Structure formats: C-alpha cells, structure tokens
Amino acid sequence: FFFSSRRRHTRYWRDWSSDVCSSDLVVIASACRTAIGKMGGALSNTPAADLGAIVIKEALNRAGVAPEMVDEVKMGCVIQAAQGQNVARQASIKAGLPIEVPAITINVVCGSGLKCVNDAATMIKAGEADIVVAGGMENMSMAPYAMTKARFGYRMNNATIIDTMVNDALTDAFNHYHMMITAENVCDKYGITREELDEFSANSQQKCEAAIAAGKFDDEIVPVPVKVKKEIVEFKKDEGPRAGTTVETLSKLRCCSGKEGGLVTAGNASGINDGAAAVVVMSEEKAKELGVKPLATWVAGALGGVEPRHFLYLNLHYHKNTQYETDFTYLGFDGLHGRSFGSGTGCSSKQNHRNRSNG
C-alpha cells in the first residue's frame, strides 16, 4: 500500500509483516453491506435508519471494535424527508452506540457515502479521532410525497404533489430536469452511442451475474430480516441484477429519458434502490494496538465540481483531483470500481480502463 500527502508529495510503502509503521496512515478495518433491494422490493418497508443500524453494528462486530470505542459516526443519506431528525444519529443509537458518540448525516447526492469515508479518514489524519464508522443508507421506496403549500392552504385551483424521490434525488436543481437528461448530455458531449451504452451495461450485468454465482458477494452481505406475508425471512440477495442480460435484450428497450432520439433506457441506467453499507475507519496505530488486520489502506479522496448539466462527468474530475493529490496513476491496478448513474457515466470516464472497470 502507499500513501501520499499533497503537502509533502512523499510516498510511503507498507508491508504488514513489518513492525515499522507510518503514523499518518489510515486503514479500513472492516466493511459490510445489505443486499440491494429494488424499488418496491424486499426492503421497501425498512426505514433507512434501520438499514444503517444493521450495517453499523455488523461493521463494528467484524472489526472487533466495541461501540464505546467509536469517536464518531458519519452516514450519507439523500432522501431525508419524513425520516426524522439526523438519520445518522438514529442509526447510530439503534446500532447500540453510546449516546455520547456524535453522528452526522451527509448529503452530496451519489457521493454521500464515500464523502463520509473520506471525511472519516481526514479526521483521523488530523488527530481528531482514532475510530470512525462511515457509510451510507437509503430507502428510495419510502420517499414520501409532499404538498408544499398545504400548511397555509391552497385557497383556489389545483394542488401539486411533489415526489421527493424525483425532486430531491433525481432532478437537476439548476436546470430542472431528470438525471436521465444529464446522462444524455454526457453522451452528446462525448459522442457515446446507444450500442456503447448497451455493451457496457450488458458487460456489467454479466460480470455481476458471474460474481453472484461464484459467491463473491456472500461475505460482504449482512442479512436483513423482512416480513413476507406472515413470516420473517432473511433478505440477502441483490434484487437489481438481471440474469441473462445481453446486448441483444438491451437493444430492444425503448428510451425512457423523454428526449427525442435519446439513448438512456431502463436497461442502461441506474436502478432505484434501497440498502446500506458501512466501514470502520481507523488509524494504522490503532489497528495495530487492537490486533486488527486491515482490509485496505485509505490513500486519498477528492471532491470536485463541474457544470450541473454535465455533472455525470464528475468521475473524471475526481480521478484527476485524486491523481494530483497522490501523484499516482491507475495503471498499476488490476481492477477499478466506479460509482456512476448508468452506463453513460461509465463509458465517459472509463474509456481507457474498460476491461478493468467494475470487474
């Protein structure tokens, strides 16, 4: 592993068999997630705070960290309407952490969970904490509808009901159009074709199908108890992946973005999902003190901003910021994973890494 500081531009290499350690290294001690539920699926009646509590508790258990040892909890959550105050605080207390442990909910839309991880690492590097739980939680299925003028009355004419899922999570607040249009904008900007989108999506689905069949995700998934009719069963299999997806099956789907001649379909766009994930972040010294064998070393994180209508290009911006911060390239990695809103983002940001992306 290596770490690089923007100020020093010094690279540190770490061999876990060595007794020598660098004091400013940050590690991931454990990680877990729920299976991902589709809209209206198995998790549709489980609040985001409950999902968050499940993964926080399990992440601590896997790391062998007692709840009272945690300095802070940071959890991302985008759709917070009608969820109650500070969803992260709810999840923290439901997970059994002491009331003295502070918790903060972060919303930078798609990047919320990873922003929590980066902030946790920054706190630890600054000496403000030794152990932080970070992650994200969301239940899009439970997003409520809102009537913004109902409090003082509509008096006359029709009332508008706002879908908080679409309004707060899936609509560009500046241009007032759906995220699917921003995906179309990226395709226009980079000359991406429908065939490329479908090929990328089919490849991603096939990799996921193979990984599920091989049990690659089994260890990271925490079962969630859900009620099915009169029984309580364990939900532990992702609902989003479609087995048997091919370029041919995807090519038959109609555009759903509303744009004439559009390229985005239900098959090459992101799903609407419910789920949660959490990691335990700590200093290397604390990991050594506790006898924890880290899963990974946190190297760097970056946040960027671009023109809202092209915000799905942000993946490239993050990559450039991270490369500046750490002075490394992606050429040395066998695999890359990118968070993106559908294959439009994937095609635009991974053209040079297609064979190693999300594999």
State what each model feature region is.
Residues I131-N185:
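Flexible glycine-/small-residue-enriched beta->alpha junction loops
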